[in-house]
UniProtKB/Swiss-Prot annotation:
Autophosphorylated. The keyword Nucleus applies. The gene is cak1-1. This is Casein kinase I. It comes from Dictyostelium discoideum (Social amoeba). Its EC number is 2.7.11.1. Residues 386-404 have a biased composition (Low complexity).
Length: 426
């Protein structure tokens, strides 16, 4: 049967679903472009699709925000056609053995902060920040982190007067308990600070592999939420972040000290992450862990680990990153030597070129530009999303209620161009 939506899109197979409805892979009949088609029963008790489609239109044009191509009604369904995206960060986290390297955490955190700042600048809070709601792009935008699922989002201030919503208590928990802020657990109305506290927990989840309040047993959902809240309150931030750079504890402490109506200092938070990045000597080359793992798994049998043991894969990732750092240190030493040589040989004829200096420019320009970004102003709607990348698709989210927009397939992760070293613009 040839099912068509809006006279323009053809529905093919189901790629996801949950309590909200179902998601199908679709195709633009005219261009053959693949899209995601989300269907919600028109008689849903708590319909969200119309509201969500309006938010996507408000956020339209933002970096890392999928575009809505069509919204309408057909028979018993509300229907939204959107950009097709790649795997979620939760999918990729599982693919990499449920632990990310510090470099990957910092590159992701930088983009995730900018996505949250963008929706806050448009007067909304997300209220469900978690790995499942961040999806990588596909094709040439495979290195771009996308924020999705605005069904629980809420306007926190008037768009004209910027009057903040009032402080309230005794609210039900909205979002995902694992990543919810302490104030959310305690029934306090959410505001901008809560999105950022949730992001802090997500980053530590990526660092640690799990959070201390996971796996708690309870007979009812209410009891489980209470146990998670108690464990979260009892776990000191320094304990949660032990063994990792102190900036992660600083990040979480900052979010917890924010007041209800406070505007978060995103520049300060990004600077925390970026200073770590520079201190570790990383290059912003979009070489995420899943790119390295994919390359390792594609090696001939004699070159790759004897099994898919996650520890072996993590060791391989660390070895490759150490090798990259050593190469960078050598380049910096050569640059220093070149500077000395240039100073002592300034009396050379003008037609004599210092070949060493010329050859080192390409290896140092990117890092210098990246350091300059530490002092750049707060968010503007510009991103370095032109890095050529090749990506395909992956399995559906581990959360059955998660809105995901990608093909249900075997795990095939995005590739990245190893020659791309351009840092993200602010």
């Amino acid at each position: 049967m040839d099912l068509r939506i809006g006279g323009k899109y053809r529905i093919s197979r189901k790629i996801g679903g949950g309590s909200f409805g179902e998601i199908y892979l679709g195709t633009n009949i005219s261009t053959n472009e693949e899209v995601a088609i989300k269907l919600e029963p028109a008689k849903a008790i708590h319909p969200q699709l119309l509201f969500e489609s309006k938010l996507y239109k408000i956020f339209q044009g933002g970096i890392g925000i999928p575009a809505v191509k069509w919204f309408g009604f057909d028979g018993d369904y509300n229907i939204m056609v959107m950009d097709l995206l790649g795997p979620s960060l939760e999918d990729l986290f599982n693919y990499c053995g449920r632990k990310f390297s510090l470099k990957t955490v910092l590159m992701l955190g930088d983009q995730m902060l900018r996505r949250i700042e963008f929706i806050h600048s448009n007067n909304f809070i997300h209220r469900d920040i978690k790995p499942d709601n961040f999806l990588m792009g596909i094709g040439k935008r495979g290195h771009v982190v996308n924020l999705i699922d605005f069904g629980l989002a809420k306007r926190y201030r008037d768009p004209k007067t910027h009057q903040h919503i009032p402080y309230r208590e005794h609210k039900n928990l909205t979002g995902t308990a694992r990543y919810a802020s302490l104030n959310t657990h305690q029934g306090i109305e959410q505001s901008r600070r809560d999105d950022l506290e949730s992001l802090g927990y997500v980053l530590m989840y990526f660092n640690r592999g799990s959070l201390p309040w996971q796996g708690l047993k309870a007979y009812t959902k209410r009891d489980k939420y209470e146990k998670i809240c108690d464990k979260k309150a009892q776990t000191k931030i320094d304990t949660l972040c032990q063994g990792f750079p102190s900036e992660f504890a600083t990040f979480l402490n900052y979010t917890r000290f924010l007041k209800f109506e406070d505007k978060p200092d995103f520049l300060y938070l990004r600077k925390l992450l970026r200073e770590m990045f520079v201190r570790e000597g990383y290059r912003y080359d979009y070489m995420f862990d899943w790119v390295i793992v994919r390359k390792l798994r594609e090696k001939p049998p004699l070159e790759r680990p004897l099994s898919n043991d996650n520890k072996q894969i993590q060791q391989q990732i660390q070895q490759q990153q150490q090798a990259q750092q050593q190469l960078q240190q050598q380049a910096q030493q050569q640059q220093q030597q070149t500077t000395t040589t240039t100073t002592t040989s300034s009396s050379q004829p003008s037609n004599v070129k210092n070949i060493s200096t010329v050859s080192n420019i390409a290896t140092t320009t990117t890092d210098e530009q990246f350091r300059q970004l530490l002092s750049t102003p707060s968010y503007n709607n510009v991103d370095s999303d032109q890095s050529p990348q090749q990506t395909t698709t992956t399995t559906s989210s581990s959360n059955p209620n998660q809105t995901t927009f990608y093909r249900q397939n075997k795990v095939v992760v995005p590739q990245s161009s190893s020659t791309t070293t351009k840092p993200p613009a602010k």
